[in-house]
Amino acid sequence: MSNLAEVAPALDEDKIVTFPGSPFQLYQPFPPAGDQPEAIRQLVEGIEDGLSFQTLLGVTGSGKTYTMANVIARMGRPAIVFAPNKTLAAQLYSEFREFFPRNAVEYFVSYYDYYQPEAYVPQRDLFIEKDSSINEHIEQMRLSATKSLLERRDTIIVATVSAIYGIGNPNEYHQMILTLRTGDKISQRDVIARLIAMQYTRNETDFQRGTFRVRGDTIDIFPAEHAEMAVRLEMFDDEVESLQFFDPLTGRVRQKIPRFTVYPSSHYVTPRETVLRAIEDIKAELRDRLEFFHKENRLVEVQRLEQRTRFDLEMLSELGFCKGIENYSRHLSGAKPGEPPPTLVDYLPSDALMFLDESHVLIGQLNGMYNGDRARKTTLVEYGFRLPSALDNRPLKFEEFERKMRQVMFVSATPAQFEKEHAGQVVEQVVRPTGLVDPIIIVRPATTQVDDLLSEINLRVEAGERVLVTTLTKRMAEQLTEFLSENGVKVRYLHSDIDTVERVEIIRDLRLGTFDVLVGINLLREGLDIPEVSLVAILDADKEGFLRAERSLIQTIGRAARNVNGTAILYADRITDSMRKAIDETERRRAKQMAFNEANGITPRGVIKRIKDIIDGVYDAGEVKAELLAAQERARYEDMSEKQVSKEIKRLEKLMMDHAKNLEFEKAAQVRDQLAKLKAQLFGASGEEAPMPPV
């Protein structure tokens, strides 16, 4: 991601910190401060004492990611950090790449730009074929993640719930690996056969990820998990004479290497003997199922199931894979009916650390994935579109995920019931490194809330500060926006129909001062930690419900916690239990923060946060000079949807390869730079690999 991999050697070496027995090199731009040193010490002690569950109760702006990075670096074990959505995952990935520029920080999220699962609607006799668009860049990052886990100890994976969906069996995936060393005895024919078994495609003209080409005694391989590096294998008399990394674009040799491990080009690759065994199992299941439908006199289902399954069996027999191969994953992995599928979690070493960021949201997500998937597949099986074994191609049930959990740290400002019941210890991170304290809370009557809010907004606008307002209904939000606008306030309304990229732009405009007030219904979502916001106004705070529950109120009040003058006004005619608990908790934290500041002579200072897209990635200093040109380019790309951006990436990749074929390497390099920026916008990463481990 970003330019950090390139910048790494220029980092201030004094700020690179290592710990005894740990392979991690932590870039510490500043030492831990506030509650961080104590939180790090307690979490590390908890892990060493063998605690299965711990909770890091970290308030907004207290540097929870930095604490996680310090714990990982001190323990020296591989780690996986779960985030509730792609946007937050990209943000975490960006931050971990900054803290660990010389270690393998990987990104494992769903690789679908668009996904329509196969489904059947019996009422209308309508079958919907599976339709999807796979994002090749994210697929490459997923393959890179599993490779790093199998090869290195200094690995951190940032993942979403995609990690609990089935992928290939790690043991069989490992069996398929091809390790090449200089001096190895192996024939060219055997190398080619192994590559084809790993689902690499031979392509002499269009050399891209997951392909290889043969020229005389030389085989060029473009590994599926690499974005910008290929391997040249030179052979002589059935012996590996030399191995080299080279640039697939320019053909320039980068370095000679003593060995290289080629990993399969898909997580679903399976050894030939396993496929043949699976085919027999599928045939046996098909016979049983057809017999069942015959007894029921359901001849349409008989014909449907037989036709579809026989076609898939033919493809498996000839090619080793078929469309929808994941529906036969139980037979391919040799699992028993009802057994959990292999997932990314199975690739983790037994001593890995797990962090569940925003755990109060994530636990609910992990709980809900199985049921939705099951309901859709049951209909497909019932009407003869799939064999019953397709039900075992599924995400993990929550209790299965729980059994596979390693030592876990829940990270949240407002832990939910599950964390409270399971935490071996709760580590508080309430004091911020900046000395900022939680907002002052004021309760005012709801009857005059709109007029009072207008006068409060005017005070903030005069001081050059921003305001967030949360309402209960869409209609109220629209009416309030209209009222404020008529009274000369620069206001925008943030609603659920706005997509992620546009949402980021709105937040950016608020920070830049294009407008002063943001009205929304749910202000709990990511990316709303804005230092310029000094007032959060909660309308109708006494109406009990999800958005006015204790946890939601604490989260919303915390949106003003990054400003020295942070204030939260709760408009209510009575104080509910949820309000009382939220106010008491905020006051408790505030008292603790103020006592710490007084004891240590700390003056609170506001957060200075550079204004950039939260999924921009990281810029190096040289990029600032080209800011104007980059801004023009970004403006064009920002108007595109995620699907359009994916098409633009494919167009640029083709253009880059065309330039390379015409030996116009300077032009090809320029297009590659453009591609890196575009990928940074879409994925929060430029697609560069983690630094190579020493060979």
Curated annotation (Swiss-Prot):
Gene Ontology terms: cellular component: cytoplasm; excinuclease repair complex
InterPro entries: Helicase/UvrB_N, Helicase_ATP-bd, Helicase_C-like, P-loop_NTPase, UVR_dom, UVR_dom_sf, UvrB, UvrB_inter
PROSITE patterns the record matches: HELICASE_ATP_BIND_1 (PS51192), HELICASE_CTER (PS51194), UVR (PS50151)
Short motif Beta-hairpin, span: 111-134
Gene3D superfamilies: 6.10.140.240, P-loop containing nucleotide triphosphate hydrolases, UVR domain
Helicase ATP-binding domain segment(s): 45-434
Record GO biological process: nucleotide-excision repair; SOS response
Domain Helicase C-terminal intervals: 449-602
Superkingdom of the source species: Bacteria
Positions that bind ATP: 58-65
Subcellular location: Cytoplasm
Disulfide-bonded cysteines: none
GO molecular function: ATP binding; ATP hydrolysis activity; DNA binding; excinuclease ABC activity
SUPFAM superfamilies: C-terminal UvrC-binding domain of UvrB, P-loop containing nucleoside triphosphate hydrolases
UVR domain residues: 646-681
Keyword terms, alphabetized: ATP-binding, Cytoplasm, DNA damage, DNA excision, DNA repair, Excision nuclease, Nucleotide-binding, SOS response
Family statement: Belongs to the UvrB family.
Protein role: The UvrABC repair system catalyzes the recognition and processing of DNA lesions. A damage recognition complex composed of 2 UvrA and 2 UvrB subunits scans DNA for abnormalities. Upon binding of the UvrA(2)B(2) complex to a putative damaged site, the DNA wraps around one UvrB monomer. DNA wrap is dependent on ATP binding by UvrB and probably causes local melting of the DNA helix, facilitating insertion of UvrB beta-hairpin between the DNA strands. Then UvrB probes one DNA strand for the presence of a lesion.
Subunit structure: Forms a heterotetramer with UvrA during the search for lesions. Interacts with UvrC in an incision complex.
NCBIfam families attached to this UniProt entry: PRK05298.1, uvrb
Comment block on domains: The beta-hairpin motif is involved in DNA binding.
Name this protein carries in UniProt: UvrABC system protein B
Organism placement in taxonomy: Bacteria, Pseudomonadati, Pseudomonadota, Betaproteobacteria, Burkholderiales
